[in-house]
Amino acid sequence: MSRAGNRGNTQARWLGTGLLGLFLLPMYLSLEVSVGKATTIYAINGSSILLPCTFSSCYGFENLYFKWSYNNSETSRILIDGIVKNDKSDPKVRVKDDDRITLEGSTKEKTNNISILLSDLEFSDTGRYTCFVRNPKEKDLNNSATIFLQVVDKLEKVDNTVTLIILAVVGGVIGLLVCILLLKKLITFILKKTREKKKECLVSSSGNDNTENGLPGSKAEEKPPTKV
């Protein structure tokens, strides 16, 4: 009985965990924040850089709060924050820490874009930039995404020689395989036709031999019609 009871308790715990996961999963999937595919971006000192950020919500949003924050090993601060009333209005900035920052995004037409433009870059701007979003309509559910900005003196040219060599080799191998397959099919087709011709020749030769030897079914066996 003890084993059966333990088995029942284990199944109940697993069932409870599964139900809890199914309950929490929509919450984690409903509000998403993205800063693009690249986790690190590079920009030249003195130039401008667009820090991308978009959000999405399955349940819509009202009075959505957003902010951009900056931090490195020495300091941390909020760069800009604001409110988006709904999907028909643009973001309204409340606080802006630096005049070099401009909100470039728009939330109209379901773009949900709260990207910022950082101008006149300095080497001290190197660090992590986090885009944070909180949606009161989803019981203040929040999410964030971080991108690392590296300010450099000049951008290094990427040497694609190795990549081009690899692509050329792979392309050559694929081309060779295709040629081999086509040649194999051609040889198979020629051999098949050759066998068919040989077979026809043998059948024809066999029929001629039967005719010459007067075998049954040959023309030599035929008799002229009897005259009455």
Curated annotation (Swiss-Prot):
Q: Which SMART domains match?
A: IG (SM00409)
GO molecular function annotations of the record: sodium channel regulator activity; transmembrane transporter binding; voltage-gated sodium channel activity; voltage-gated sodium channel activity involved in cardiac muscle cell action potential
- SS bond partners: C53-C131
Write out the topological domains of type Cytoplasmic: 183-228
Q: Which UniProt keywords apply?
A: Cell membrane, Disulfide bond, Glycoprotein, Immunoglobulin domain, Ion transport, Membrane, Signal, Sodium, Sodium transport, Transmembrane, Transmembrane helix, Transport
| Database matches in InterPro entries | Ig-like_dom (IPR007110), Ig-like_dom_sf (IPR036179), Ig-like_fold (IPR013783), Ig_sub (IPR003599), Ig_V-set (IPR013106), Myelin_P0-rel (IPR000920)
Q: How is it modified after translation?
A: Contains an interchain disulfide bond with SCN2A.
Attached carbohydrates are found at N45, N71, N113, N142
Q: Name one GO cellular component term.
A: intercalated disc
Q: Where is the Ig-like C2-type domain?
A: 31-148
Where does it localize? Cell membrane
PROSITE patterns of this UniProt entry?
A: IG_LIKE (PS50835)
Q: Give the Basic and acidic residues compositional bias ranges.
A: 219-228
Q: Where is the sequence biased in composition, kind Polar residues? A: 203-213
Topology check: give the Extracellular ranges. Answer: 31-161
Q: Where is the signal peptide?
A: 1-30
Any single GO BP term: positive regulation of sodium ion transport
Q: Which residues cross the membrane?
A: 162-182
Give the membrane topology. Single-pass type I membrane protein
- Give the protein family: Belongs to the sodium channel auxiliary subunit SCN4B (TC 8.A.17) family.
User: What is the annotated role of this protein in its UniProt record?
Assistant: Regulatory subunit of multiple voltage-gated sodium (Nav) channels directly mediating the depolarization of excitable membranes. Navs, also called VGSCs (voltage-gated sodium channels) or VDSCs (voltage-dependent sodium channels), operate by switching between closed and open conformations depending on the voltage difference across the membrane. In the open conformation they allow Na(+) ions to selectively pass through the pore, along their electrochemical gradient.
> What binding partners and quaternary form does the record give?
A voltage-gated sodium (Nav) channel consists of an ion-conducting pore-forming alpha subunit functional on its own that is regulated by one or more beta subunits. The beta subunit SCN4B is disulfide-linked to the pore-forming alpha subunit. Interacts with SCN1A; regulatory subunit of SCN1A/Nav1.1. Interacts with SCN2A; regulatory subunit of SCN2A/Nav1.2.
This protein's name: Sodium channel regulatory subunit beta-4
The gene behind this protein is Scn4b
